[in-house]
Amino acid sequence: MNPKILAVLAAIGLVAVAGGTFLIGWPSSEDSSDSTTTYVTYTDTDDDEEEDDTETWTATETDADTISGFSIVYSSGTEGCYSAVLQSNGEYVITFSGITEDTVYLISGTLNGSIVIDAGDEYDFKLGLDGVTITSSYNVPIRADSAKNFHLAAKSGTQNYVYDKRGEVADSGISASVYSACDMKVKGTGSLTVVSDNNNGIHSKDDLRVRNLTLSVTCVDNALKGNDSVHIKSGNITLYASSGDGIKTDSTDTSSSGVQRGNVVINSSQGDTVLSIYAYCDGIDAAYDAAIEETGGNSVTVTVKTYTGATTKTLNSSSSWGGHPGHSSSWGAGGNDSNTNKITTISTKGIKADNSIVITGGTVSIDSYDDSLHANSDVKMESTSKYGSGNITVSSGSLTLSSSDDAIHADGAVSVSGGTVTVKTSYEGIEGASVTVSGGYVSVTSSDDGINSSGSITLSGGYVYVYAGGDGIDSNSTESYKGIIFSGADVVIVSTSGGNSCIDTDRGYTYSGGRVLAICPTGMTQEALNTGSSAKTYKTGSFTAGSCVYASVSGTMQLAVKMPVSISSGFVLYLGSGSASFGSASSVSSMTEVFSGVYVS
């Protein structure tokens, strides 16, 4: 069948019906039931994974009368399967139905109204955006009630806009600018701007996948929501959520094929990914896992700002960045779970997951009011009837974290085996039921404890620097000599509070390898060590800000730190030799700088 353009409001006739409503075209089919989710996993399993979003559309325009500047172009599949109703409020509702095969249409121009997809459960429906602006003050601008998969694709070189101008929507209503009751794929090589004045930006009841396109979403509540999963595979995505989360999932059960639901996955399997999130609440709120990974030889860059970090953006609509209940519209300075000076009880974390957070690559920058990374263990998962693990794992990538609370908080275990973790500001830097650093580079700046655990802290590899206003490294474990275990890492600690210690345990710590240089004011400094004096050297002294304090063994400098503050009556400890000497110099040019002001031989 030759493709042709089907123009809405063209010469197919207007039929008057009761109440001043007009029908154009063909009637809708009966509603179909929602499709069943079949996808959510870290591994790509899309049936169209190799599809080229720069594909040549088969539609060719023929002579037609395009009234009011809006057109529908048939491309492939079921032809002539839409109806258009002019409502008494002046808006059109265009419904695609009666689909008997996978179907593709393109739309262009300006529509004051909404589009409804009712394709049944057997066939994919693809709506191509070819330079379109859709605005509705009464309905969801784009709504897919049924399809096997709903594809929303921005054509290459086009700019497309969807505006939901509705006010508050009833709890029983659909409050999103783009909504799908089935799996939805938002893609293309053009651009798409979505604005919602009342609630969510883009919402899929099942799985939501985004790739390739330039996407901007501005909304009141959640910018991207997939009840079962959200998977970003490539593209340049910017999200603004004035009262909600940037990305959110809800489900924790498994699909009929046994795939775990509730994951948020950000990778680069389809090209470079640049994701920027500005959210009043959580940047990412995953009901199960949150994962960031570099795949396919491409890069991932994620920037998240929450609450105080996101104050510069206002909605391009009647909505504003208003204050949360009990707070003014000006976002104030931060507070946190550990810090009792918090001014709000809402969750304003950077990345939050109710099971685990896994980062295996990418460049991640988070400026959060609450914890930057937070994994819970107090939410029961439907799939297992067990509580989440609460684990956070970093094996590669570069993380830069700023928080008014914990930079990294795991109800379970924190594990860093590679990559670079830089905590620029925090109340407590890293906190977990256990903390393990076996590789990589970890730098922590905190106003209270640098690394804190209710259980064990094991530093077995990599490089660790802690600059803390409280305890440098603090374990509350009650196991003898198991609170802190130094077994291979190079560790430098500077603690500035006289009432705290650079190394603090309840029942002692163990040294079996690596090198440790620790400096703090005199006070709580004599922690029990299960290794004798052959591995420990210490002395008292004063230390001047800007000077390089070093530990030397047999005439070779081992570790050094450029003092960030002056300590008039202090204590310096070196683990690694019982005969180390200490000194101070203006510079240590012969050593390698692994962090700013931290040096190793």
What do these predicted regions represent?
Residues 2-601:
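A composition-driven surface/loop motif
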